[in-house]
Amino acid sequence: MTSLNRNARELLAFYRDAGVDALLGDDAVDRFADEFDRPAPKTAASSPAEAFPGEQVPPSPSLARKGGGSSISAPAAIAVAPPSAEAAVMSARAAAKGAESLEALRALLQTFEGCMLRTTATQLVFADGNPKGRIMFVGEAPGRDEDIAGLPFVGRSGKLLDLMMQAIGLDRTQAYIANIVPWRPPGNRTPTPLESAICLPFLLRQIELADPDILVCLGQPSTQTLLGTKEGITRTRGRWFKFDTGRREIRALPTYHPAFLLRSPLQKRLAWRDFLALKKALAG
């Protein structure tokens, strides 16, 4: 009974800190129609033109011959075409493999030119927290606040993540935090499949170098990308998966992304269950 009372108090404290102030919402929520339950994206664009929209070279104007009605085409402008999807991903893999430390990996990403997001973002958002911590959280991509600060999860969703960690006795000195994509996509749009595929080798190397005991996938994109599943987050959250870091096999736990919880606060009760499972795993 004492254990049940303690868990109940912790749950109420979690709800209070997370901003839940009502037992029921104004509108009914269909929990089987989660907005993140969409098919897994393809791992690469079918062509460079699809991967890099808006970069087509305009057609060359025609030059009229003197004294005639026919025309000849002017030489086409020479443009540097973006690398093919396969070449871009292979380049990223080769570069990431050469990083022998997290510091070297960060420095490498600072100068890596294989991802177009680097040219539109304010700065690299590499990681935050303690790389020697037992747990590593991975989201999808930085937002506006993260782009400005140069750190992941510092906006509203980051504050909620901090509260969720605090509810089970954790803080950023005990956890390591990163994203699949380390640069903010323009307008906070979703990263393209090619952008995620190019950045993935760096994240995998980052996980290998940090070598956490437990990996927490925040949201569906992180879960599907890292765990190779096509199932939606409503089916995968709260389930333990195996993940090979390159050094050893560790446990991975998918859960809802804090940004989703801000939009769907009633789902926080399920996230709380996931974090209780995480707390138990860390204590074991």
Annotate each predicted stretch with a short phrase.
Residues 6, 21-22, 26, 30-31, ...:
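A polyanion-binding, active-site-adjacent surface
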Residues 1-17, 22-25:
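Non-catalytic accessory regions outside enzyme or core folds
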